[in-house]
Structures are given as C-alpha cells and as structure tokens.
Amino acid sequence: MAARKMITASVTAATALVAVLATGTPAQAKTTKFCGPPAAFTLGCFYSEGDYFTVQDMRADGKRGVLKWQTDYGRKGECHDANGANNPPTKCDYDFKEGHTVLFQTAVRNGANGADEGLSNPMIAWISGR
C-alpha cells in the first residue's frame, strides 16, 4: 500500500513538472527606448532600435541642451540641441556594436564648450534592445 502511494505521488509530481516545462513562458517584449529623468532641464532618450539619441532643451534660458554618452567599449560623444527651448528634440544617429551598453546623461551649456550645468543622473541602456 505504501509503495502504491509513493508511485502515485511520483507520477503526479512528474506529470506536473512536464506540464510546467512544456508550457514555457511568454516571450518578453524588448525595451527599445531608454529615457533620462523627466524633471531634468534637458530631456534625453536612447533608442536601441536604430541606435540614436534624442535631446531636447526644456528651459528657456538661452543655453543649449547636451546629451553626453559613452559605451562600455570606450566610444563616447555628445548630442547637442541648440534650436531653442521647448522645440522638437534633436536626433543624433549612430551605429553601435550590438550586445553592449551605453551610459548617458544630460546637461545644459552656455555654448558648445561651456561648463556643464544641471547634470542629470546617468542612465544606462542596452544597445541590443533587450
């Protein structure tokens, strides 16, 4: 009798395990848009599908919005929005290596080479769109 209960329990457990493994999990949607903090003076986003940034100056102070970026493999650069505050964002297109990360943050500058002001917290994004 005890052996029969043990076999029944084992078969039930095995059946449950097969059911769980056969069902699988739903595919996860990949994230393709990574944006910085919404309260920043300059808004910045990275779009992993297309490898581009957008940067938008949100403060009417005569200064420009700047997005600074650096990949985990050493490449770096900047994207500038000098078309005035509250206008459509500036798009900067790049071609990055897939499967890496990019760190970016935004700032406000007086001219292209001015000192960074109002530097946002850094954001990290997957270049591969995971």
Stretch-by-stretch model annotation:
Residues 1-43:
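N-terminal prepro-regions of secreted/extracellular proteins
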Residues 28-130:
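Post-signal peptide N-terminal regions of Sec-secreted extracellular proteins
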